[in-house]
């Protein structure tokens, strides 16, 4: 469901295999080692919720999923820039100070229903807002949906 490579201290898989990892290879990603999370692993980490009304939704929704800082902590990731890659190749990134200042989650569900492909899933990077703050175009660029890969470091 999610592969994380780069400056991580804990790994559970070897290098990219272009035949078996065709979606990763299609995006021209490459790594020697990584950590691969399945849904159960992500659900076992401390979870967070975010209630927001992104442009893709007609009404506010409650999103839930593992806290990004917990995902990164679990794999002993360096506190450096993290790049998020969506299935369609779209990328976004966060710096450590961005991650520390807000409760970012990798949302697995909205209103209790899993986010599927075509519904901003399997994972949607989304965060809490200050009281009264609403997402705008500047924020929306960080809300990467259909996330399946993260790279820690350049």
PLM features per residue range, with description:
Residues 1-154:
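N-terminal intrinsically disordered, low-complexity segments enriched in P/E/S/T
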